[in-house]
Amino acid sequence: SDTMVSIIMLVHGAYEYTKNTIETLQMTKGNYELIVLDNDSDCKTKKLLLKLFNKGMIDKLVFSKTNTLFAKGNNIAFKLCSDKSDKVLLLNSDIDIRNPYWLQEMLENYEKGILSLGVCEKPPYVRVDGYCFLIDKKLYEKYRLDENFEWWWSITKLQAQVLNEGYKVKGVKDHSNLLFHYGGASGNDFQNSKGMQTDDKDIIKWFNEKNIDIIDKIDNDNYIFNSKSKANRIYNKLKGR
């Protein structure tokens, strides 16, 4: 498809994971641009981003003097989206792309609204994850991420708003054949961030009894996995493998 996707990635340190995400992203088939917003990383990570930008691996690069966290950071980066794109994909910087067709598979399974890799079934409500989150650009523009919820509840609220407008929100449960999310690589700044103490009852109310659709798995066996990459070695060491 000729659909152009604006991929937005926030970076806060985590040098090896960030490097791995952007380098493995290069195998992606399809029409996309990569917009990176650096949330006040260390010098080493900033230099890496400049190097990857100069190599053409990053299309648009912004350095923030403070850590804008998740909601505000994505909203700032969104303003840089090309006029040509009609979808936005929020992608974490601790990802291992493991299939060149991951983006095309997402586009093929997408219906107007949201398609996300990863489902969170923990209380208070079954919802999609936010580390690989594809959304209609006009819907993102309409709602943005609510900056009163600086971290993940902003993604939860956005999907509830999209569901309440009558659009689809779909989550792919097993996406291990497409990409892997390492998780927790950018530190603990989220713990004291605004909106983290949101009451479960409020979150349930957002959804208005509307539910996401769950896709068990998207079949595609063009799987490419480099177990020896530095990021995979670091991850396995942390997990004691």
Annotate the PLM regions:
Residues 64-81:
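Glycine-rich, basic loop-to-helix element that forms the pyrophosphate-binding segment
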Residues 38-47, 96:
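A conserved acidic beta->alpha catalytic loop
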Residues 23-32:
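Short, acidic, metal-binding catalytic loop of nucleotide-sugar glycosyltransferases
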Residues 149-152, 156-241:
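C-terminal catalytic/acceptor-binding lobe
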Residues 85-96:
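Short beta-strand-to-loop acidic/aromatic patch adjacent to the donor-nucleotide binding site
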Residues 112-121:
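A short, conserved acidic/glycine-rich loop-to-beta-strand motif
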Residues 1-24:
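N-proximal low-complexity "stem/linker" segments adjacent to membrane-targeting elements
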